[in-house]
């Protein structure tokens, strides 16, 4: 290469270096903005003592986990009225190895929190719609990610489609219990006068299974106790086995 060609190549190389640095800076700025947006708007803060009215929180514990063993959390918003709705999400069920292997249920949480909330409540009882009869109620939401009607306490070993040994964590009842205990300790809602336990699909089965536990252990003094099972149907001929 002669001196003339070398001289022409130097500015191009310099420009490429500058462009590369600009791209790196832009990527870093976008990453920082994404993190800020996530923690400021999309990820709810952890529940604290005496939570603010009308603000969403996540209710987490290290022992809470989804079907794959990853972290799980419930969602909470304190209302201005002395009324509480406990809402169980649906999303399939797993009762044997075939169903565990084929993922016939929600296997993990929807992230981030805001999306999980919107997805769970779109058009539902706990949605933030002006004029809703529940808009000023305290809301306790349980996303579904354990395939056990929110009522499991065990582990199920199975072989997946790739021949790998796996564990399905039926941890729904443990998640529910840990969340309820934390909420009752921090939120100041133990004297609610009206309580509604509800859920749809698989969450409807949770409603039927857990409502007695809720009214016995958490809201025994509520004057108005309600249970609403929504759209829950299970056709399985071997259920009695």
Name these PLM-found stretches:
Residues 36-53, 63, 155-156, 169-196, ...:
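Surface cap/lid and interfacial helix-loop subdomains adjacent to catalytic sites
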Residues 93-95, 148-149, 204-206, 233-238:
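Flexible loop/turn segments at secondary-structure boundaries
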Residues 1-18:
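N-terminal Lys/Arg-rich, disordered targeting/topogenic segments
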